[in-house]
A protein has these predicted regions:
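Blade-level signature of beta-propeller repeat domains, shared across WD40, Kelch, NHL, RCC1
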Residues: 398-427
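C-terminal motif of bacterial Sec signal peptides marking the signal peptidase cleavage site
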Residues: 17-20
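Residue-level detector of Asp-centered blade-edge/turn motifs that repeat once per structural unit
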Residues: 158-161, 198-202, 246-250, 293-297, ...
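A short loop-to-beta-strand structural motif that recurs across blades of beta-propeller domains
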Residues: 172-176, 214-218, 260-264, 308-312, ...
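Gly/Pro-rich loop segments of beta-rich domains
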Residues: 59, 124-154, 181-194, 222-242, ...
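Short loop/turn segments immediately following the C-termini of beta-strands
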Residues: 161, 168-169, 208-212, 249, ...
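Beta-strand/beta-sandwich contexts
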Residues: 22-66, 112-124, 129
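Conserved beta-propeller blade signature
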Residues: 163-166, 204-207, 252-255, 299-302, ...
Length: 427
């Protein structure tokens, strides 16, 4: 019976795959029964009952309809599956990324929502790989992703086309790594830049010059990622600026220099520059800092390299509060008031509000769970540098300086001394 059941599932899958036309999974409406709002939607079962991200799944029931624009399949409450096709009684979909565990599955057809009695056992796979350059081999070489050699990475941006824009501190260059085309090229030479601000559509990245006069360049998809100067200087800011950031919208570009001055520049009228706070956070040893807007908390998070902690900063810059760290140097995990950080730098935030921090001096990646504030080490080993790929707890990094997140919530990590880009895949 078990073999017959598996065979039946395979036949159904083949039929629905055929309806989806081709390997690219583009959709065309298959023959089937349209949705009838006068009848109930029924959810019988689904197969398989376990797997990971992108597992092919068949949902069985009745009155689903054939219009995939009117169908949603949700795992674990709010994780939406990609719908490939439906014949009215069976939906073919791809399992979305979600938390590990036994998760509920729901089908939404128009205004009707139905739930399965059984759960889907989702398993998470985690892996660290090197995607650009060679670990601990600094240099200047363009070419394929593996042949390319990079300098000390001080900023990363993920833009459209699955392209990475990379700034190099020591070589005064901005590079582009085309992940799909397997190619690395140089976009600009002669200036130092840190982490850019990237628009939500990922079509534009703004870089602020590291040192005064802080020339701002933008790199746009419409201009084939070639640099265009926005302004030649930011008046009133004489210290080093490591990071540019957007707030809740893209009207203003925010930044903080290493004298502690926090401000913003209006992108519609770049002549408008405002100093929001003259003394934003501690400034030990003229430290570098990173900024990122946290949408759920509705504030900036600001990491300070040699203060070994992270601040919360209000949008107007007036309220600055300790958020995490400032408990001495170390890698102790725990809640916000007890965890230790060593030189936190680049930060990324996932859709649930969890915060990921690259720690350059002790070579690890940390996670701050939102909203409970639990700090954990998710990759690398405290105080040990290296160049080991593989499962996260066995991986080793060399100066992870920046971290960014893609649309599937995988992470790219730019290494300062390691001179390479690593990828932390969580599926």
């Amino acid at each position: 019976m078990k073999g017959m059941r598996s065979l039946g599932f395979a036949v159904v899958a083949v039929g629905l795959l055929a309806a989806a036309c081709n390997d690219s999974e583009s959709y065309s409406t298959p023959a089937g029964t349209p949705y009838d709002p006068s009848k109930p939607v029924e959810f019988y079962t689904f197969e398989p009952d376990s797997g990971g991200m992108r597992t092919k799944c068949i949902i069985k029931g009745s009155n689903f309809g054939t219009d995939i624009e009117n169908i949603k399949v949700l795992f674990n409450g709010d994780r939406e599956a990609r719908i490939i096709s439906s014949n009215g009684n069976m939906i073919y979909c791809l399992v979305p990324k979600q938390a590990a565990g036994n998760n509920k599955v729901s089908v939404v057809i128009g205004k009707d929502t139905v739930h399965s009695e059984k759960t889907f056992a989702y398993s998470v796979k985690e892996l660290v790989t090197t995607v650009v350059g060679k670990n601990n081999e600094e240099g200047y070489v363009n070419g394929s992703l593996g042949e390319a050699r990079l300098g000390w990475i001080s900023g990363l941006a993920l833009v459209t086309g699955n392209n990475l824009i990379i700034s190099e501190r020591n070589f005064f260059r901005v590079r582009l790594a085309a992940l799909e085309e397997n190619q690395v090229i140089t976009l600009m030479e002669g200036s130092q830049y840190g982490k850019p601000a990237v628009t939500k559509d990922r079509k534009t990245a703004y870089f602020i010059g590291y040192g005064s006069p802080h020339t701002i360049y933008k790199f746009e998809q419409d201009n084939l990622w070639q640099p265009r100067r926005v302004v030649s200087s930011i008046p009133g800011f004489d210290g080093i600026i490591q990071c540019a950031a957007f707030g809740p919208n893209e009207e203003w570009l925010y930044f903080r220099d290493n004298t502690g001055k926090f401000g913003r520049l209006n992108l519609e009228d770049p002549g408008i520059v405002e100093v929001l706070n003259e003394h934003c956070g501690d400034t030990p040893n003229a430290t570098d800092s990173h900024l990122i807007w946290h949408p759920q908390m509705e504030c900036f998070l600001m990491s300070l390299e040699f203060a070994h902690g992270i601040y919360k900063v209000s949008l107007d810059g007036k309220n600055v509060e300790i958020f995490a760290g400032f408990n001495g140097i170390g890698g102790q995990d725990g809640y916000l008031n007890e965890a230790q950080f060593t030189s936190p730098m680049g930060m990324a935030i996932d859709r649930d509000g969890n915060i990921y921090v690259a720690q350059v001096q002790n070579h690890i990646i940390r996670k701050i769970s939102y909203p409970d504030g639990l700090v954990s080490t998710i990759a690398g080993y405290n105080g040990q540098s290296g160049a080991v790929d593989g499962v996260p707890y066995k991986s080793r990094f060399n100066g992870p300086w920046d971290i960014i997140i893609d649309d599937e919530e995988n992470f790219y990590i730019g290494q300062f001394w390691g001179s390479s880009v690593r990828k932390l895949s969580i599926e």
